[in-house]
Design a protein with these regions (language model features):
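A short glycine/serine-rich beta->alpha loop
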Residues: 27, 69, 144
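A short, structural micro-pattern
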Residues: 32-34, 55, 200, 225-226
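Glycine-rich phosphate-binding loop plus the immediately following alpha-helix
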Residues: 43-88
């Protein structure tokens, strides 16, 4: 993991901002569950949102290109789901909402169930869920809702910047003490951070490799001769999404060093 402000690389241009999560879904990996990813994103220098000290979590809502103008993070859940359904030319009960399986989401879950939408509870790793919600050729998740990590919001925004869609976020204090500390530091807790606020650059790249097999990517598979990995790479300039199946041979790797 990189700390905020850490410098990496060989010191030569081009200069870029880097966001990385070596394991998005640490609990998933520890328990051998599906969906753990290694994730990295880059953008022009100074264009990625850097969370202020003390900001750990954000409220989030993420959708695909057809619904990008339909969402408002300040609106009630029922209103957002109605707008999303209309934009998708579907019914609310056709929608699938991804939510992290956490006690803090009990009220959101209740509201989603009240209007009849389906729920997919995810154990960890909301970056993959945000990407799946934004992908036009994936219909397993229509919207990501709930509270997750602030660094993961930037990574998700980088991917969404490449493929279209929209993510909106707001800083979420975990308790009153944290809320008062953030206010004292001059942080506006009502501010909405959209995709272009989280990643302002127009030259964005995103890549993820599966660690444990999930719906987005296969996990690492080990063999006597080496390993096979499954990755996705995206670029904002072209909107290109590439899936890469790579074979890594132990003998060749040691010779290359």
């Amino acid at each position: 993991m990189l700390y905020i402000g850490e410098h990496v690389g060989n010191g030569h241009k081009p200069e870029v901002d880097v966001a990385v999560d070596p394991v998005d879904g640490t609990r998933l990996l520890a328990l051998g569950l599906p969906g753990a990813l290694a994730v990295v994103a880059t953008a022009e220098r100074g264009t990625m949102y850097s969370a202020p000290p003390g900001v750990f979590y954000m409220e989030k809502i993420a959708v695909g290109p057809a619904m990008r103008n339909a969402i408002d993070i300040n609106a009630p859940v029922a209103v957002n789901l109605d707008r999303i359904a209309r934009a998708r030319e579907a019914r609310i009960d056709d929608l699938t909402v991804a939510i992290l399986d956490r006690p803090r989401h009990a009220e959101i879950i209740r509201q989603v169930r009240e209007v009849g939408a389906r729920i997919r509870l995810i154990g960890d790793g909301d970056v993959a869920a945000a990407i799946q919600a934004a992908m036009e050729d994936y219909r397993g998740i229509d919207v990501l809702l709930g509270i997750g990590g602030a660094p993961e919001a930037v990574l998700a925004a980088a991917a969404i910047k490449c493929i279209g869609g929209e993510i909106q976020c707001k800083i979420w204090p975990r308790n009153d003490q944290e809320r008062e500390k953030l206010k004292a530091d001059g942080i506006d807790l009502s501010q909405i951070y959209r995709t272009d606020d989280l990643v302002k650059g127009n030259d964005v790249a995103f890549a993820a490799t599966g660690i444990t097999t999930g719906e987005l990517l296969d996990g690492v598979q080990y063999f006597g001769w080496g390993a096979r990995t499954s990755s996705v790479m995206m670029r904002s300039r072209s909107g290109t999404v590439r899936y890469i199946q790579a074979r890594h041979k132990w003998r060749k790797s040691s010779q290359a060093q």
